[in-house]
């Protein structure tokens, strides 16, 4: 950390290692138990059927062998694979984070600039997904990923600190650098290396303007405030295969408020004035796609009393 002269800010560099504990997928235990029970039942049917066929009198052994082979082929196709108990446990996640940036005061300290670049390298990244049955969620380790990006923020206070302007933007390039699941049960190669990491917006931005005007300390209305803001994010992928996601979206909000005598604050607000419809979360389960969407235009009134 290096402080700039004349109180103009500071330049910093940081390196940190993060750790996220592993654990157990309790919700998937019932799936593995049912898979094991189905497998044992089918193996029992196979063994019993073979014994019955072997005991059929007056049937040539060649015919018995052919009947057993045909039965075995059918049962093999419907018998579940042996459950993999290792899926009950997911490993810890490790992350090395590198960041460099500057906090800089400009225009006689009327404008503050925050700028940062970062790189995060994650090993055994933990990602939540639904269990194969669609009932419950499990955590899996996704190999390695790398996230690089930049964040910039501007803040200015004008008119004797009565007007505050802010603007922020962030860009993140997050991809899997190694996420090879091998060959699936259907024989399909599953390799997500190079795909985007889900749930990470590629772009984020916000801007706001807020004003607070003093009236009189002796009036019933002491101060009057109003402002507006715009926020946006996207695009966002919802799965490791990058098959569906949320495009970039933006919303507009506004508020009007006042501070009254007796330490009472009123704030009338409006959110999503643009009526933008976007998904805040989405997933595939049991052959269907589900999504949770944001609230439509919303209006409200907050009343606060400080005592």
Regions from the language model: what does each represent?
Residues 79-87, 132-139, 187-193, 236-240, ...:
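Extracytoplasmic loops and strand-loop junctions of Gram-negative outer membrane beta-barrel proteins
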Residues 110-123, 138-239, 304:
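Gram-negative outer-membrane beta-barrel transporters
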Residues 19, 121, 159, 230-239, ...:
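C-terminal beta-signal and adjacent terminal beta-strands/loops
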